[in-house]
C-alpha cells in the first residue's frame, strides 16, 4: 500500500499519508502541507493521486493552491516543482478544452491553459516540459504549424526528448505526413523502449494509413499484449476485421467493437460502428441511442460526422425525411463542407431532397458525390432522373449513357436510359429496354411487367404489331385473355359488343365454366395496351372484350370507357358514344380527356352550344393548362366562323380572331405543338395571308415528317389548299397525290375530290374525269361525285366546241362526253332520294337540257369536221405521192453521181498502178547496166562546155511539161460531161500514156548504150532515184519521192529525144539540178501528186 511522508517542521517526525486513503476533503491535506511547509513535489504527488482516483476537484484544488502567490513567494527558489505544478494545470485545462463541446466554454478552458503555461515560462522560458505542454495545447486548438514550432524548440536543444518526439509525430500525422510521423514514433520507441503502449498505437495507425495493413495489425496486436484493455487498439483491429468483407472477419470485428464498448462505453468510434451494425439489423432504437451517446462524448469532427450520418440513415429508412435531411446536413457541416473527407452524407441528403421535391438541391449534392466518385453508377443514374425532371434531357442522356458504359451489366441503367429516349429516339429506347430485358434474363431475374409493357408499347408505336403482341402476352402471362387471343372462345357466341357494356353476365358465365377473370392491378395497363393493339389490327370484338373485362374488375378505369366510346363513334353510333363518355364522367366529372371527347361528339352531333360549354369545362378542369382542351375551343371557333353559309363578315372575323388567340396560347405553352401551328396556318389562310400560311404549313410538315409518333395528313391537305388558292395547280396536284399515297394508300375519296377540283380549275378535263371515276369506285353511294362527273363532262364538251380549231377525233370525243353527261344527269334525275343528297331536281333537268343541246351541236360539228378531215386526207395523199416521186428522182441522181465517182477512183488507181510498174522497170534496168570508169571520167571533163545548151533545152522541156500538165487538168475537169464524151477522153489519155511510155523506153535504151562510171549513184540521187544495191539505208521511204522519180523520168525521156546523142551524163546531171531549182516545176509536181 503506497504512502507518502510529510516531514514535521522543527522535528524529526513525519506524517504518513496513505495514497489509497486520501481524505475526501482535500482541505485537510492542504492544511498539513501548508503547516509543515512540505516540499512541492509532495503536493504534486498527492494531486496526481487524486486525479488517478477520479477526484478531479481535489486534484485541481491542490494544484491551484500550490500555484498561488503565497506559495510562489515562499518557494521562490524552487523552480522545477513550481513549473511542474503549473504545467500540470495547463495540461488539465487543455484536456478540458479539447473535450468541451460548447465553443464558448472550450475557448475559456484554452485561455486558462495558456495562462498557466505562460506563467511557467516566466519562471524558466527554456524548460522543455513547458514547451511540450504548449505544443499539446496548440495541437488541441488546431494550430498545427505553431504546435510544430513548439516541439521543434524542444528537439533543437534535446533531440531525444520523448514527449517532444511524440508531439511532433502527432503533428505530422495530422498533417497527413504519415511516413515522417512513423519515423518519429519509431525514434521515440528506440530512445525509450519502455514507453507506454500508446506509442505503438501511433505506429499502427501510421502503417494503416500507409496501406501496410499486416504491419499495422502487428502493431495493434502488440498494443493489446502490453495493454489488453486498450480501447483504441480494439477499435482499430475491429475496423480492419470489418473491412475484410467476409462473415468471419465481420463477426470478429463486431466482437472487438463490443469488447471496446464494454471496456469504455464512451468510445465514439466503437459506438458508431455498433450503430452501423444495428442499422443493418433493423434495430433503429439502438442506432439512435448509440449515435446520440457518441455525439455526446466526442468533439472530433469526422467522428461526429459519422454519428450524424448514422442517425440520419435511421430516420431516412423510417421515412422521416425532414429529420433525416437535418442530420445529413449536420454530418456535412462537421466535415467543413468537404466531400472528400466524408461523402456519404451528400448522397443521403440528395436522396432525401429528391423525395421532398427539392430537385436543384438534390442535383447539387449528387454532383458533390461525383467529385469524389466520378464513376459511381448510382449517382449517375440519380442525376439522369433529376435532369430529366428539370427538363435538361441532354445532360440526363449524358449521365445515363455514361452509367451504361461504366457498367454494361446494370439493367436498371438501361431501363433509365430507355425511359429518357422514349420521347426523342424510339429506336434507341427500344434497344435499351431490350438490353435491360436480356441482362435480367441472363442474371436469372424476373423481367418486370413495366419493362415488357414499354417494349410492347414501342413496337406498337412503330407499327410492329406482331412483336408488340408477343411482349404484351409475355407481360400478362396466363389469363382469360389468352383464350380469346388464341380464339379458343367464340366471341360471337359469348355476345361481346359495345352495346352490352353494362352486361356483366358474360363474365359470370365464364366464372361458372371454370375460367378465371382475375386481372392483377399491375397488369391492368398492359391489358389495356393489348386491347388497344387488337383494336388497331381490326380485332374489334376481342378488344371490346378486354375493355369490358377491365371495367368489370376496375369500374373506375376511365380510359376503357373512352375507348369503347371511340369504337361506338367509329360505328357512327353517336348516342352510345355520348352515353359511354358520360359513364366515364360519373367516375371523374372533371376528367379533361372525357370532357374533350364529349365536346367533339357534341360538335359532330351538331350541338354547338353544348360542345362549346363542354370544351370550356375541359379547359377549366386543367386551369387552362390542357393543350387539347384549348385546341378544341380553337377548333370550335374556326368551325363556327366557317359554318354560316350566309357568311356574316363581322361574326366570321370575330370567331377567326378568337381561334387564332387560342392557337397562339397553346403555342406559348408548348412551342412545338404542331396541331396549334396547323390551326394558326388555317386562320392565316382564311384571312388571305397565303405566303405566311404556306411557311407555317411547311414548317409543320417538316416537323411532322421527322416524328414516328405523329401522322398529320391535314397539314399536307392545307398546304395543297394554299397552293390551289395561289393558282399553282402543278404543286397542288403533287401535294394531294403525295398525301393520298403517304397516308391513305390512294383510297380517300375526299382528297380525290380536292384533286379533281384542281384538275377542273386547270382545265385538265380528262385527269379530272379519271379522278372522279376513282372516287366513285371507292364510294359508289355518293351521288355528289356522280353529279361532279356529269358537270366535268359537260364543261369538257362545251370547251371543246368553243375551240376555233378542233379535230374530228376531238369532236367525236365531245359527242361521247355529251352523251355520257346526259346519261349521268338523267340517272340522277330519276333517283328518288335527291333531297337526301342535297340536289335540286330542276337544276339537274337544266343540266340535262343543256347537255342535250351540246349533243345536237356536237353532231353538226362532227359532220363538218369529218368532211374537212376527208378533204385533208385527200390533199395529204396527193402531196405524199409527189413527195415519193421526188424522192425517187433524188435517189436516181445520187446513184448516178455515185457511179461516176466510183469510176473516177478506179481510173486513178489504175494510173497509179501503171506508174508504179514503170518505176519498177526503170529500177531493174539501172541495176542491170554496167558502168565504165573511163567514160565517166570523160563526161566529167566535158561538163563545163555543155552546161548552157543543156540549160536551154531544160527550159524548153519545162514548157512542154507545163502544157502536158494543163492537158491533164482539163481531163479531170471534164468528168462531169456525158458518158460517151468521157470514153473519148479516156482513149486520148491512154494514147498519150503509151506515147510517153515509148519515149521513156527510147531514153532508157540510149542511156543503156552509154558507159556509166563510179558516180552512177550520184546521178540516181540527182534524178530522185537511188540504187538499193549500193546502200540499203538509202531506199526512199515515201510515195511522194517515188512520184517525183517517175516525173523526172518522163522529163528526161522527152529531153533525150531532142538533145544531141553525144551529150554527156554530166550535162544531164546539171539539167536535173536545174529542175530541182525551178520553183514552177516543183509546183507542177505538187499539183500532180495532189491529183
Swiss-Prot record:
It is found in: Nucleus. Residues 951-965 have a biased composition (Basic residues). Its main location: nucleus. TPR repeats lie at residues 90-127, 128-161, 163-195, 197-230, 232-267, 305-338, 343-376, 377-410, 412-443, 449-482, 558-591, 593-625, 640-673, 674-707, 713-746, 749-782. GO terms for biological process: flower development; negative regulation of flower development; positive regulation of DNA-templated transcription; transcription elongation by RNA polymerase II. SMART domains: TPR (SM00028). Component of the PAF1 complex (PAF1C) which is involved in histone modifications such as methylation on histone H3 'Lys-4' (H3K4me3). Involved in regulation of flowering time. Required for the expression of the MADS box genes and flowering repressors FLC, AGL27/FLM and AGL31/MAF2. Required for histone H3 trimethylation on 'Lys-4' H3K4me3 at the FLC and AGL27/FLM loci. Involved in the control of seed dormancy and germination. This is Protein CTR9 homolog. The gene is VIP6.
Amino acid at each position: 500500500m503506497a504512502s507518502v511522508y510529510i516531514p514535521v517542521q522543527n522535528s524529526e517526525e513525519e506524517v504518513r499519508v496513505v495514497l489509497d486513503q486520501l481524505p475526501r476533503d482535500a482541505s485537510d491535506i492542504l492544511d498539513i502541507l501548508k503547516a509543515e511547509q512540505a516540499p512541492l513535489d509532495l503536493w504534486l504527488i498527492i494531486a496526481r493521486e487524486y486525479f488517478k482516483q477520479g477526484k478531479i476537484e481535489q486534484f485541481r484544488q491542490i494544484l491551484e493552491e500550490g500555484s498561488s502567490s503565497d506559495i510562489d513567494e515562499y518557494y521562490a527558489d524552487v523552480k522545477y516543482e513550481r513549473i511542474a505544478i503549473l504545467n500540470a494545470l495547463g495540461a488539465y485545462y487543455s484536456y478540458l478544452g479539447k473535450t468541451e463541446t460548447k465553443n464558448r466554454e472550450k475557448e475559456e478552458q484554452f485561455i486558462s491553459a495558456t495562462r498557466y503555461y505562460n506563467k511557467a515560462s516566466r519562471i524558466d522560458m527554456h524548460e522543455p516540459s513547458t514547451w511540450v505542454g504548449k505544443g499539446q495545447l496548440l495541437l488541441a486548438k488546431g494550430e498545427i504549424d505553431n504546435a510544430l514550432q513548439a516541439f521543434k524548440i524542444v528537439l533543437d536543444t534535446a533531440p531525444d526528448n520523448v514527449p517532444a518526439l511524440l508531439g511532433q509525430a502527432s503533428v505530422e500525422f495530422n498533417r497527413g505526413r504519415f511516413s515522417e510521423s512513423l519515423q518519429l514514433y519509431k525514434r521515440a520507441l528506440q530512445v525509450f523502449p519502455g514507453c507506454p503502449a500508446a506509442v505503438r498505437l501511433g505506429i499502427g495507425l501510421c502503417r494503416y494509413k500507409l496501406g501496410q495493413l499486416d504491419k499495422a495489425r502487428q502493431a495493434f496486436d502488440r498494443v493489446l499484449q502490453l495493454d489488453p484493455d486498450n480501447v483504441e487498439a480494439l477499435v482499430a483491429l475491429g475496423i480492419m476485421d470489418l473491412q475484410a468483407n467476409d462473415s468471419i472477419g465481420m463477426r470478429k470485428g463486431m466482437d472487438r467493437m463490443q469488447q471496446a464498448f464494454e471496456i469504455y462505453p464512451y468510445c465514439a468510434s466503437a459506438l458508431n460502428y455498433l450503430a452501423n451494425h444495428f442499422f443493418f439489423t433493423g434495430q433503429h432504437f439502438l442506432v439512435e441511442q448509440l449515435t446520440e451517446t457518441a455525439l455526446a462524448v466526442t468533439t472530433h469532427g469526422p467522428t461526429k460526422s459519422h454519428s450524424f450520418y448514422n442517425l440520419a440513415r435511421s430516420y431516412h429508412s423510417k421515412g422521416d425525411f425532414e429529420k433525416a435531411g437535418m442530420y445529413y446536413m449536420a454530418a456535412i457541416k462537421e466535415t467543413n463542407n468537404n466531400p472528400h473527407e466524408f461523402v456519404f452524407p451528400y448522397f443521403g441528403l440528395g436522396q432525401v431532397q429528391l423525395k421532398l421535391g427539392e430537385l436543384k438541391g438534390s442535383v447539387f449534392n449528387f454532383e458533390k458525390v461525383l467529385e469524389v466518385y466520378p464513376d459511381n453508377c448510382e449517382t449517375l443514374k440519380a442525376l439522369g432522373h433529376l435532369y430529366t425532371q428539370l427538363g435538361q434531357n441532354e445532360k440526363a442522356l449524358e449521365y445515363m449513357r455514361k452509367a451504361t458504359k461504366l457498367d454494361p451489366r446494370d439493367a436498371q441503367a438501361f431501363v433509365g436510359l430507355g425511359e429518357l429516349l422514349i420521347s426523342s429516339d424510339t429506336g434507341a429506347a427500344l434497344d435499351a429496354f431490350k438490353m435491360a430485358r436480356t441482362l435480367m434474363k441472363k442474371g436469372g431475374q424476373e423481367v418486370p411487367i413495366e419493362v415488357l409493357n414499354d417494349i410492347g408499347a414501342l413496337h406498337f408505336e412503330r407499327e410492329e404489331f406482331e412483336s408488340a403482341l408477343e411482349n404484351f402476352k409475355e407481360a400478362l402471362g396466363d389469363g382469360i385473355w389468352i383464350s380469346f387471343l388464341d380464339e379458343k372462345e367464340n366471341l360471337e357466341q359469348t355476345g361481346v359488343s359495345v352495346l352490352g357494356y353494362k352486361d356483366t353476365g358474360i363474365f359470370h358465365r365464364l366464372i361458372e365454366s371454370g375460367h378465371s377473370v382475375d386481372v392483377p392491378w399491375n397488369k391492368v395497363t398492359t391489358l389495356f395496351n393489348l386491347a388497344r393493339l387488337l383494336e388497331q389490327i381490326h380485332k374489334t370484338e376481342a378488344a371490346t372484350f378486354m375493355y369490358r373485362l377491365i371495367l368489370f374488375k376496375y369500374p373506375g378505369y376511365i380510359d376503357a370507357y373512352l375507348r369503347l366510346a371511340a369504337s361506338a363513334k367509329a360505328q357512327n353510333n353517336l348516342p352510345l358514344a355520348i352515353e359511354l363518355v358520360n359513364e366515364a364522367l360519373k367516375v371523374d366529372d372533371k376528367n379533361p380527356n372525357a370532357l374533350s371527347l364529349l365536346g367533339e361528339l357534341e360538335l359532330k352531333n351538331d350541338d354547338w352550344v353544348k360542345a362549346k360549354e363542354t370544351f370550356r369545362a375541359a379547359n377549366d378542369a386543367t386551369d387552362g393548362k390542357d393543350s387539347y382542351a384549348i385546341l378544341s375551343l380553337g377548333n370550335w371557333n374556326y368551325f363556327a366562323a366557317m359554318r354560316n353559309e350566309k357568311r356574316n363578315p363581322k361574326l366570321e372575323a370575330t370567331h377567326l380572331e378568337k381561334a387564332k388567340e387560342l392557337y397562339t396560347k397553346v403555342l406559348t405553352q408548348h412551342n412545338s405543338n404542331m396541331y396549334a401551328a396547323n390551326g394558326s396556318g388555317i386562320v392565316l389562310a382564311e384571312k388571305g395571308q397565303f405566303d405566311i400560311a404556306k411557311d407555317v404549313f411547311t414548317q409543320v410538315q417538316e416537323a411532322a415528317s421527322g416524328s414516328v409518333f405523329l401522322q398529320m395528313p391535314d397539314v399536307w391537305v392545307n398546304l395543297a389548299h394554299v397552293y390551289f388558292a395561289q393558282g399553282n395547280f402543278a404543286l397542288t396536284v403533287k401535294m394531294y397525290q403525295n398525301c393520298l399515297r403517304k397516308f391513305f394508300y390512294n383510297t380517300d375519296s375526299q382528297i380525290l375530290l380536292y384533286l379533281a377540283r384542281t384538275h377542273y380549275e386547270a382545265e385538265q378535263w380528262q385527269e379530272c374525269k379519271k379522278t372522279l371515276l376513282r372516287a366513285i369506285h371507292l364510294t359508289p353511294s355518293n351521288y355528289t361525285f356522280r353529279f361532279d362527273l356529269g358537270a366535268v363532262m359537260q364543261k369538257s364538251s362545251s370547251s371543246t366546241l368553243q375551240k376555233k380549231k378542233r379535230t374530228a377525233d376531238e369532236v367525236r370525243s365531245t359527242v361521247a362526253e355529251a352523251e355520257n353527261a346526259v346519261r349521268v344527269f338523267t340517272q340522277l334525275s330519276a333517283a328518288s332520294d335527291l333531297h337526301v343528297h342535297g340536289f335540286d331536281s330542276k337544276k339537274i333537268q337544266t343540266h340535262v337540257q343543256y347537255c342535250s343541246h351540246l349533243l345536237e351541236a356536237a353532231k353538226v360539228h362532227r359532220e363538218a369536221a369529218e368532211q374537212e378531215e376527208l378533204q385533208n386526207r385527200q390533199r395529204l395523199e396527193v402531196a405524199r405521192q409527189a413527195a415519193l416521186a421526188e424522192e425517187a428522182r433524188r435517189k436516181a441522181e445520187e446513184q448516178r453521181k455515185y457511179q461516176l465517182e466510183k469510176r473516177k477512183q478506179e481510173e486513178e488507181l489504175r494510173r497509179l498502178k501503171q506508174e508504179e510498174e514503170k518505176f519498177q522497170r526503170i529500177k531493174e534496168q539501172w541495176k542491170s547496166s554496167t558502168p565504165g570508169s573511163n567514160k565517166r571520167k570523160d563526161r566529167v571533163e566535158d561538163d563545163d562546155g555543155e552546161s548552157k545548151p543543156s540549160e536551154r533545152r531544160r527550159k524548153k522541156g519545162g514548157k512542154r511539161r507545163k502544157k502536158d500538165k494543163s492537158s491533164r487538168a482539163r481531163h479531170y475537169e471534164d468528168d462531169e460531161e456525158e458518158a460517151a464524151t468521157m470514153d473519148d477522153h479516156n482513149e486520148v489519155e491512154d494514147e498519150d500514156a503509151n506515147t510517153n511510155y515509148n519515149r521513156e523506153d527510147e531514153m532508157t535504151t540510149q542511156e543503156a548504150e552509154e558507159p556509166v562510171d563510179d558516180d552512177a549513184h550520184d546521178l540516181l540521187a540527182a534524178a530522185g532515184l537511188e540504187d538499193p544495191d549500193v546502200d540499203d539505208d538509202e531506199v526512199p521511204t515515201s510515195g511522194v519521192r517515188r512520184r517525183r522519180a517517175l516525173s523526172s523520168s518522163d522529163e528526161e525521156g522527152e529531153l533525150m529525144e531532142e538533145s544531141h546523142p553525144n551529150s554527156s551524163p554530166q550535162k544531164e546531171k546539171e539539167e536535173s539540178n536545174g529542175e530541182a531549182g525551178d520553183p514552177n516545176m516543183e509546183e507542177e509536181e505538187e499539183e500532180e501528186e495532189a491529183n
